[in-house]
Amino acid sequence: VTDHYQNTSKLRPTLKLYRADYRDEQAMTRILEAYDTPAPFQLSPIDPETSRTSSISGVIHFAAYKAVGESIRSPLKYYSNNVGGLINFCSLLGDFGIKNFVFSSSATVYGTVADMGVALREEHCSQNLTVFVDEDGKKQMVQPGCSGLTNPYGRTKWMCEAILNDLAHADPEWTITALRYFNPIGCDESGHLGEDPRDAATNLMPVVLRVISGALPVLNIYGDDYDTPDGTAVRDYIHVTDLARGHLAALKSRADRGFRVYNLGSGRGQSVLELVAAMEEVSQRKIPTQIVGRREGDVGMCVAKATRAEIELAWRTEKSLETCCRDVWRFLERVGNGTLSNA
C-alpha cells in the first residue's frame, strides 16, 4: 500500500484543492474571490456586482449525496444538501459571473419508466414541452414531467434539474448542462486511482472487489425475479473515464446557452450476473454469491439511449464492460488483496 501511494504522489495533477463544504457560503466566497478578474467596464452603475468576472470558465457539480437506500432512511439530509445546497451555490456563482455549469444528474430520475423495456431517451423525463421523432419515424410530443420516481435521491435530482431549468430561462447568460449518469464503474487504466469507499459500499463494483479481496465473504444479489433474461437487474455500465470525457465535452459545448439534458450511458444493458461473470473471467477467481430480496427503490432495467450526446456533444462510450473489469482488477492488484475496507 505504501508503494502504491508513493507512486501516485509522482503523478501530480495541475489542480489546486480546497477543503470546504459547498454549503458554507463564507468558505466558498473566499475561494471564488481568489479567481476574481477585473472587468473591462462596469456593466451597471446601480449594482457594481454585475460587473464581476472570474477566471473560472465553468463549474462541475459533484457535491450530492447519492445512496438510494440512505435517501429513503434520511430524506431531509438529501433534500437539504442536494437541493438546498444547489440553490445557494448557484446564487453565489451568479454573483461572481460564473455561469457555465455542469450538473451531475442521474438515470434514477426515470424511476419506474425504466422498466418499459426500451432504451431511455431524455424525453421520457423532460423539464419542458418536447417534440421528437421516435424510432418508427413518428413525431411525438411530450409534456413536462417525470412519473414513477421511486426514492428521495431521484426526486432531489429531478428537483435540481427543474431549478436549473428555471434559472436558465430566467437568465439567458447561463449555460447549464445536466448529465444523467447511468451506472459508472471501472477506474483509471493505470491502476493508481480506484474506488474504495470509506463508508459502507452501496454500488455493485466496490462490493464485488471486497468479496474478491476477502474483505467480505459473499456478494448479495438483490433479486433474481425481475423481467430480465436471467432474472437479475439489468444496468447500463459506463466506464468512469468515458464519464469524465462526457463532462469535458459538456463544458466545451457552449454553442447554445440555456438548459440541456444528456444521457451518459453505453446503450448496452448487462445484468448483475453478467458483470459477475466478466469479473470472474478477468480475475480468474470465483465470486461467491447469494440471492436476497429486492431492495426498496430499485428497478429491474435501466438502459440509456445516448444519441443526443453523440450528435450534440460528439461523445460516445469507448470502453467495454470487460475493460472496466480489467481496470478495477489492476487497481486491486496494485493495492494488494485484503487491503480494501470491509465496511
Regions found by a protein language model. Name each.
Residues 1-187:
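N-terminal Rossmann-like NAD(P)+-binding domain of SDR-like oxidoreductases, especially those catalyzing
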Residues 2-3, 182-203, 218-235:
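Short, flexible, glycine-rich and Lys/Arg-enriched loop motifs at helix boundaries
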Residues 23, 205-207, 212-343:
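C-terminal substrate-binding subdomain of Rossmann-fold SDR/epimerase-dehydratase oxidoreductases
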Residues 78, 118-121, 193, 221, ...:
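Short clusters of hydrophobic/aromatic residues that line enzyme substrate/ligand-binding pockets
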Residues 111-113, 186-189, 272, 298-300:
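A short beta-to-alpha transition loop/helix N-cap that caps and shapes the active-site region
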Residues 122-133, 191-219:
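Mobile, glycine-enriched helix-loop/loop "lid" segments at the mouths of ligand-binding/catalytic clefts
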Residues 151, 159, 180, 195, ...:
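Amphipathic alpha-helical recognition patches that constitute DNA-binding helices
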